[in-house]
Design a protein with these regions (language model features):
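Extracellular carbohydrate-recognition regions
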Residues: 466-490, 610
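Short carbohydrate-recognition loop motifs
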Residues: 491-510
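Exposed low-complexity, polar/acidic, P/S/T/G-rich flexible segments that act as propeptides
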Residues: 591-609
């Protein structure tokens, strides 16, 4: 299929004139696990500093409702680089790679129009040990960017990467070659991008720069780390430092374009690949404020990210664009600007005439998602989320409550209409239809979302649920009652002879177990006391949020170390909260199991929850 497509494009290229000087260069910068709040221009968090990205927003367009196609790395990247919903070719989640070689990337699409292309940084579209079912990990080299139309590449997230050229742009013999650079990841990735721009300044180019930031492992790169606010938790400071390093690299790229006289002939996109992940353990560096949910969810916190475009002299400076757009639009925009004929396989739209006011209305009537056991659709106002066959959520995105109030019971006709449209879209996908069986991790995500926001899930009687769901619900209710309102996440909590045993789930990287309580009303400061025993030493963390905070923040955490002991140990932590504490988490490391008892919370006004 791919060879036929390539021959057709070659025929078009041979019949077409040489590449026009009017063809703009196109740069796509993709960040990693970069929450909506962590762009200072969003004005969502006072601690973030992104002067160069802010300059992009000032000199270009900030899309405040910019979406990606999935709340996870691999499918999001597959969607943006092809311009097609990744479900059409089977890359639905991180376990479903690699990107099929038959799929046409932006680089391959632009090549017949005279473009030279490069990929830098995280690729994540090759086979891995987790995708053995689709392609052997040992065959990863056959799926690197060079096999997908990129003329040059430096492919890898960290300090070791596969490359076609060295960082000075000299071709390597028998590529790909494995290279190592000891500097912080963003630094060498920026250098590779600058080298490519310098050497191809006189021909149209496409650069896909995928910074591996601020994704874990969190690091403390200097000099950026020293500039972060010292009062913040370590993980937050590390994320801010990593974002600052990326931001500085983007500033170098913008400066190089100006120095080469290319800024008015270069369209630059900046997009985050998905929302920030769960803010506990090593994953709490970035923030999604004020959005709800996180990476792994189809609420806006998982799929609505920083989204900018800059093209001086063509795009209006300082424009804040309100209608929803999606990462699929990058490929369609690039193809149109390259002068290629319209291709119905592309599922995005050319954004330029909409942003310039040459086309009226919104670029999209509807946007769709299907990921794991979740599916969603949104129009200009409403968003419907289906969680398997178990739950439905209808959100009014134009209301102050947003995704914290389920309007399903209030607007059943709206929900029915959106569900019909979602079903129609899903019928066109392979395999057709909506996911029905509920994924356990998705249940954890949405249970926590319900706990945090108070949003009401679909009202069902016990008899409405399938047998497996009824059994799960009954077990969950029994555990919750026995634990006096404490609920476990990333683990199981059971009671035996007056002792609560927290058993963590193995094999989940950086997702430590925690117990959580919501529905509180404790005046700060709040004191946690508990007794524990365990065969492994560790560090216990207390996180909290008040009624004035829509989500947990890295600042609201306290920690205490404990030893391995067969005896009971008393732990006390004080949350120096001001206001009313409504939700807490008690976090534990990844020990096999921990015994707990006498877990108590006391507020300043002698209120208590045991």
């Amino acid at each position: 299929m791919k060879s036929t497509f390539a021959v057709l494009l070659l025929a078009v290229a041979l019949a077409a004139p040489a590449a026009s000087a009017a063809q703009p260069n196109i740069i796509l910068i993709y960040s990693d696990d970069h929450g909506y709040a962590d762009l200072a221009a969003q004005k969502a968090d006072p601690d973030i500093r992104t002067p160069h990205l802010d300059a992009m927003a000032r000199d270009g367009v900030r899309f405040v409702r910019g979406y990606v196609t999935a709340p996870q790395c691999v499918p999001s990247r597959a969607g943006v680089i092809t311009g097609r919903y990744q479900q059409r070719f089977g890359v639905e989640d991180n376990l479903k790679g690699p990107l099929p070689l038959a799929e046409i990337t932006i680089a391959e699409r632009l090549k017949p129009a005279g473009y030279v292309s490069a990929q830098v940084g995280k690729w994540h579209l090759e086979p891995t040990p987790r995708s053995e079912e689709q392609a052997p990990a040992a065959n990863a080299h056959a799926f690197l960017p060079g096999a997908q139309g990129f003329d040059e590449y430096w492919c890898g997230p960290m300090n070791t990467f596969m490359a076609s050229h060295d960082l000075q742009g000299r071709p390597l013999s028998n590529p790909p070659q494995r290279l190592t650079d000891p500097r912080f990841r963003c630094v060498w990735q920026t250098d590779a991008a600058l080298s490519f721009i310098d050497r191809h300044a006189r021909e149209p180019f496409f650069l896909y720069l995928a910074y591996f930031t601020p994704h874990v492992p969190l690091q403390s790169p200097e000099p950026w780390f020293a500039r972060t606010p010292a009062h913040l938790p370590l993980e937050r400071r590390q994320a801010l430092a990593m974002i600052a390093a990326m931001d500085e690299g983007i500033g170098q790229i913008r400066a190089r374009l100006r120095a080469l006289g290319l800024e008015k002939n270069t369209l630059v996109f900046f997009i985050g690949d998905n929302g920030a992940p769960l803010k506990q353990g090593a994953w709490n560096g970035s923030l999604n404020t004020p959005l709800t949910g996180e990476k792994g969810m189809l609420t806006d916190g998982g799929i609505r990210t920083p989204f900018l475009a800059e093209w001086p002299g063509t795009l209006p400076a300082g424009k804040v664009y309100e209608p929803p757009v999606i990462s699929l639009d990058v490929a369609a925009t690039a193809a149109a600007l390259a002068g290629l004929p319209p291709d119905p396989a592309l599922e995005g739209v050319n954004l330029i005439p909409f942003v310039r006011g040459e086309k009226s209305g919104a670029p999209h009537d509807l946007l769709y998602w299907r990921w794991r056991s979740q599916a969603a659709v949104r129009d200009a106002r409403w968003k419907l989320i289906l969680l398997g066959k178990e739950e439905k959520f209808l959100f009014d995105l134009e209301s102050p409550e947003g995704e914290t109030k389920n309007r399903l019971a209030d607007f059943p006709a709206v929900a029915a209409d959106l569900e019909k449209k979602l079903m129609g879209w899903n019928a066109t996908l392979p395999p057709p239809g909506l996911p029905r069986e509920l994924n356990a991790q998705d249940q954890i995500f949405y249970d926590d979302h319900v706990l945090q926001t108070g949003v009401k899930a679909t009202k069902r009687t016990a008899g409405d649920r399938p047998a497996a769901a009824r059994k799960k619900a009954a077990a969950t209710a029994a555990t919750t009652n026995a634990a006096q309102g404490w609920t476990a996440r990333n683990g199981t909590l059971t009671e035996r002879d007056g002792v609560l045993e927290l058993r963590t789930e193995g094999g989940r990287r950086a997702a430590n177990a925690f117990i959580t309580r919501t529905g509180l009303a404790l005046a700060g400061p709040v004191t946690l006391t508990l007794r524990l025993r365990t065969a492994q030493p560790g560090r216990l963390g207390l996180a909290w949020r008040t009624d004035a905070q829509p989500d947990f923040t890295p600042e609201n955490q306290k920690f205490a170390d404990y030893a391995a002991s067969a005896d009971w140990q008393a732990i006390t932590l004080v949350a120096p909260a001001t206001g009313k504490v409504i939700h807490v988490r008690v976090q534990f490391p990844s020990a096999d199991s921990i015994d707990l008892r006498q877990i108590e919370l006391h507020g300043a006004a002698a209120t208590s929850n045991k």
